[in-house]
Regions:
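Alpha-helical "lid/cap" subdomains adjacent to substrate-binding clefts that gate access
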Residues: 48-72, 125, 129-169
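Conserved donor-binding/catalytic core segment of Leloir-type glycosyltransferases
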Residues: 229-248, 254-258
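Donor nucleotide-sugar binding/catalytic pocket of nucleotide-sugar-dependent glycosyltransferases
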Residues: 130, 143-221, 225-231, 235
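N-terminal subdomain of nucleotide-sugar transferases
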Residues: 1-45, 91, 116-118, 255-260, ...
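A short helix->loop->beta-strand "cap" motif at the edges of active sites that frequently abuts
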Residues: 116-121, 178-180, 201-202, 269-271
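A conserved catalytic-core segment of Leloir-type glycosyltransferases
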Residues: 22-95
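A conserved, positively charged/aromatic
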Residues: 90, 113-116, 136-140, 171-178, ...
Length: 273
């Protein structure tokens, strides 16, 4: 995974690593950005190399968009990264488990090197990037079901735009990827994968992200309110890295709250977000 702790994919990957370790499995986590002193977590590359891979990918996207910053981080093209197959941790591994590997962690060529190693690969998808050309969420676009081109996230889309060129590279990459097992973290994501041209021939399993029962557990509601100094209201909890990101769905949450108020399910003064 690109990061050890930052972001939902990183948290999910690290929880899995810790659970496997507790169960007695020898597991290592390769990351671009290490954020702890754990000996199980191994950083890839030097600091200057990491900056170069990150900047080079963004530079290519920026120039293809004629120097517009719009959607600069909405897409990823995996044109640069690190060859992890030479690392001792990789060579010693029986199974390779990929998570979120964008922003300079692995290039498409690096992923091909992993496939060509002959080791069985599990890839957990935390968004749609693997089954589209360059976007992490297709929104209403359905071109990933046929062939990505005329990309809505590019300033000047066309039949042979950046999205189409990356799509063709991915198509070639995944056509020779065996054995590859895909994991989706939700049934919705699984349905998108099974409709995509790139991955619909691959086996897909749904394994939702889990929560630690030690950190998250049921408690008496009134006691919890008292201990946490929570107001005596209907509390709705919403969390996201950025609530201004449309794919996080905050607008749907607000619509739902309005409906609850309009239908008098909850009085407005008794709601706490």
């Amino acid at each position: 995974n690109t990061s050890e702790k930052t972001g939902g994919a990183a948290i999910a990957a690290r929880r899995l690593m810790e659970s496997l370790h507790t169960a007695g499995t020898d597991v290592k986590m390769l990351v671009l950005h290490k954020e702890s002193q754990s000996e199980q977590v191994i950083p890839v590359g030097k600091d200057w190399q990491k900056k170069c891979t990150f900047l080079w990918e963004r530079l290519v996207i920026w120039t293809n968009n004629l120097f517009s910053r719009k959607n600069l981080f909405t897409v990823s093209i995996a044109n640069t990264g690190f060859n992890v197959t030479k690392l001792p941790a990789f060579r010693e591994a029986d199974i390779i488990h990929l998570h979120w590997i964008n922003q300079g962690m692995l290039s498409l060529n690096n992923i091909q090197e992993i496939f060509e190693s002959g080791k069985p690969v599990v890839w957990t998808l935390h968004d749609m990037w693997e089954c589209t050309a360059i976007c992490h969420h297709a929104h209403t676009c359905t071109l990933f079901k046929s062939e990505c081109r005329n990309c809505r996230f590019l300033r000047f889309p066309g039949n042979n735009d950046l999205a189409h060129r990356v799509f063709k590279k991915k198509q070639k990459l995944f056509s020779h990827a065996s054995p590859l097992n895909i994991v989706a973290v939700s049934t919705w994501l699984s349905s998108q994968i099974q409709q995509s041209t790139l991955l619909k021939e691959k086996p897909v399993s749904v394994i939702p992200n889990t929560l630690s029962p030690t950190d998250f557990r049921m408690m008496d509601k009134e006691l919890s309110r008292k201990e946490l100094s929570l107001p005596d209201k209907h509390i709705i909890l919403f969390g996201a890295a950025r609530i201004d990101d449309p794919i996080k769905g905050v607008e749907y949450l607000l619509q739902a709250i309005r409906l609850l108020i309009e239908k008098k399910q909850f009085p407005q003064e008794k709601l706490h977000l």
